Amino acid sequence: MCLLRGIPFVDLAYLRKSDLRDNVITYRRRKTGRPLSVTLTPEAMILVKKYMNRDSSSPYLFPFLESREGTKEAYREYQLALRSFNQQLMLLGELLGLGDKLSSYTARHTWATTAYYCEIHPGIISEAMGHSSITVTETYLKPFRSKKIDEANRQVVDFVRRSAGGLIS
C-alpha cells in the first residue's frame, strides 16, 4: 500500500482488474470520488503480480472480495478483510517489537510522512493521495513539522559556525 502512494485499504480492496492497464492503476477514490492514476514502480508491480486475484471470473484485482460491488455481502467481505488485515499488521508490529500499533492507515501515513521528509511539497502530497484539500494533508504532517524545523535550525547553526571560521563554538 505504501508503494501505491498510500492507497487506502478500501480503494485497494475494490480495485478491479480493468483498473490496471500496463503499469498504471486508474481508479476513483471511494471517500472523495476523485479520480487517481498511480504509475506502478517495478517494485510495486512485482507485489501486484504476486498478490493479484488468480480467479479469472472475479472482476477484482485482489482476492479480498467475491460478491458484486454495491451489495451488503461485498461490504461485509470488505469489513472482514480489513479487520483481518489490521490484525495481521498488529501481530507483525508486535513480532518486530514496534511500540506503535500498525494498521492499514499506517502505510498511508508513512507514504505522506516519507514524502514530506523527502521535501516534496505538501500540495503534491495532497494531490498524490487524492485528498479533498491540502488542509487534510497538513493534518497528516503537523506532528512532524517541529522536527523538520529543528533540523533546519541545526543546518543553519552549523552553516553559521562553519562560515564564522571558528569564532562561534
Tell me what each language-model feature is:
Residues 4, 14-50:
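Conserved tyrosine-mediated DNA breakage-rejoining catalytic core shared by Y-recombinases
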Residues 86-127:
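Short, basic (Lys/Arg/His-rich) helix/loop patches that form interaction surfaces
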Residues 50, 56, 64-72, 155-169:
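C-terminal secondary-structure termini that scaffold catalytic or DNA-interacting sites
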Residues 10-13, 125:
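Alpha-helix N-cap/helix-start motif at helix boundaries, enriched for small hydrophobics
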Residues 26-39, 72-81, 99-106:
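Short, contiguous acidic/charged loop-to-helix segments that flank catalytic cores in large enzymes
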Residues 18-26, 98-100, 120-139, 164-169:
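Short, polar N-cap/turn motifs at the start of nucleic acid-interacting alpha helices
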Residues 29-33, 68, 129-154:
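Catalytic-site neighborhood detector that most strongly recognizes the C-terminal catalytic loop/helix
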Residues 1-7, 114:
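Short pre-functional
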